[in-house]
Amino acid sequence: MTTNTTNPWVRTHTEVLDQRALPMPAAWQATQVNRLPTLEVGRSIHISGNQGALRDELITLLNQAVDMAVVCSFLIADPAIEAALKVTAERGVRVYVMLASEARLGSEPNQGEFDQKTHAQHKAMLKTLGKSVLFRTAAHFHAKVVLVDPYTRPAGVLLTANLTQEALTRNEELAVRLSPTQVEGIAGYLRWAMWQTAEHELLDGHDFKAAKLVSSVQHPTPQGEICATTMKHRGIAKQLQQALKNASSHIIVSSFGWDVQHPVVQQLCQRAREGLKVTVLARVRTAAMPALLALAESGAQVYGFKWLHAKALWTDAGDAMVMSANLEAHGLDDSFELGALLDVRQAEELKVRLEHWQNIAPWHLLPAPTLGDLSGEVQLWRNGQLNRVQVLTEAEVNLGEVVAQSAHQLETPRPGVSNPSQSDDPAHQLKCCWTATAPYSHPKASPQMRPAQGNEKPQPYSPKVLREPDGRLTIAITQPSELNAAVQLLGEMGAAAIVIDRGQRP
């Protein structure tokens, strides 16, 4: 559209661009769904949440201990759990706690899982409980379980959550109420890891010292209801690969960590390419993007969360597991990790939990969207970083002023616009506005005279004809009424353009 202005030498243009078909980088699209409440403690599959029900379940478990309580967590930073451990120990119950080493903890904040406040709480907990609880630590301790009386009245819970306040009340986390057989099996792994692989122990509540190994403790024989990753066994990875192979139509998988090069992730991609419905739940993290993009490009539906930390697998073939291991080498190939295999009823309960999260997921990964696929809040994957942008339905941009080729043709092509893939506020419909102005005469142009006939003096052209330093001819006018004559003269002289006499410049 063209609009005339009060200035005869200026014309305003507008053009609406439909940019919806333009390609965009891979993007997390906000889903705008409401987070629906749900029961945190189920029949045997629990989730964390702001009700604190999972934490209460763990405290109840510790309170029922008579002879022994064994806890394994990357770290502990929850006042209620700390108090329950203290009370349990003061009742005369032997309390064993397995944690990651202090050296490992020192590097973890850079990975974004724990903040400095959580570390401070953890260190304070060590001082408080160090004289009544036996702590053994190792860099590879990553399993998360709470067991009580494993050899007399076995009960326990396997978690994906570390025993921190944030993990138990904020994150998307899972926990499994273990059967007596599973408790006994896990106790065997914990016993071996504690006495054979621990690096340090805290006996006096003050200083960690090198741990003495107990050579008589043997690595347990793998059994059917639990899986583990140890320096001698890769049971979790093997179980995952077999479960993925068994699946015939549907797979749901959740993890915090992802490695695109790991065989398990490669197998997931392959099953998606084969046409299986693969649903992926993950935390939105830069480090995970290569794997999550590979999954999405293979056909998986990938859903993102701010705090998800749960690790689990469900398939339509009946295989299901909740585990501490991430889908990467440190977790499936090394480290100390534990997983619980689920029976049919538990598997169905896990599926319900995972589908609930899918339905309330705040983000959905689109591997190759067009701009029209995106709206509202979006995280674009650009140059190895996630950038938050707002995709608008429509927007207006002023493209500035363009000097026309000639005063009698104030129609100018639209100036270029920025690529929406690089914009922080791309719009489906972009209304572009710009002004076209008539060119002015060259400041060093010289007037040209009509050829003289006979003894007549050369006369100027009307309108004026100017020759620019490079030889280009132009017709100079001062007012719109001269345009018709200028156009005629333009043709006669073979001039390049009609310009406005510089003396008329405002």
Protein language model features and the residues they cover:
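HKD-type phospholipase D/PLD-like phosphodiesterase module
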Residues: N7-Q64, C72-L240, P263, Q270, ...
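A generic alpha-helix structural signal
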Residues: L62, A187-L190, K351-L354, V403, ...
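Terminal interaction modules at protein C-ends
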Residues: T3, A175, I252-Q261, K351, ...
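An anion/phosphate-binding loop that grips the pyrophosphate of nucleotide cofactors and donors
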Residues: A65, A247
